[in-house]
Amino acid sequence: MVDFRHIVRVAGVDLDGNKQLRWALTAIKGVGINFATMVCRVAGLDPFMKAGYLTDEQVKKIEEILQDPVSHGIPRWAVNRPKDYETGKDLHLITAKLDMAIREDIMRLRRIRAYRGIRHELGLPVRGQRTRSNFRRGQTVGVSKKKK
């Protein structure tokens, strides 16, 4: 039997060993519950096992799948960056790489003066929400009562 570890390090993130493997993997930024379950199935692991029982070989296998999921058999629609803007490849970015890619995408939209980029610049909602009553900032101005 493998020794139980309370903290397991996968892809540079500390995972809770007491949680089920699929829920523990969601602590990695860019990995949701469905993607985590797919990674477990492709790696040949039970998604319901406790993450603390992972061996070093199993951790390496999970990290390999997270680096290039499409080549390991995870479908193209499941990755978070299909047809990447710069490379044209299907990528799945996690942790700091995901943050950096999102920041670069917003900077590109601002640079080309796209509508979405301008909305980001102004700090306004980007996805078409109404702004009359929501997204207000600053002090609220009360209404004073009329003197008699």
Curated annotation (Swiss-Prot):
Which GO biological process categories is it annotated with? translation
The yes or no answer to whether the keyword Magnesium is present is no
Q: Does the keyword rRNA-binding apply?
A: yes
A GO term for molecular function: rRNA binding
Looking up Pfam families in the UniProt record yields: Ribosomal_S13
Q: Which UniProt keywords apply?
A: Ribonucleoprotein, Ribosomal protein, RNA-binding, rRNA-binding
Q: Which GO terms describe its cellular component?
A: cytosol; small ribosomal subunit
Family statement:
Belongs to the universal ribosomal protein uS13 family.
PANTHER family per the UniProt record, alphabetical: 30S RIBOSOMAL PROTEIN S13/40S RIBOSOMAL PROTEIN S18, SMALL RIBOSOMAL SUBUNIT PROTEIN US13
Query: What does it do?
Result: Located at the top of the head of the 30S subunit, it contacts several helices of the 16S rRNA. In the 70S ribosome it contacts the 23S rRNA (bridge B1a) and protein L5 of the 50S subunit (bridge B1b), connecting the 2 subunits; these bridges are implicated in subunit movement.
Subunit comment:
Part of the 30S ribosomal subunit. Forms a loose heterodimer with protein S19. Forms two bridges to the 50S subunit in the 70S ribosome.
**Name listed for the protein in its UniProt record:** Small ribosomal subunit protein uS13
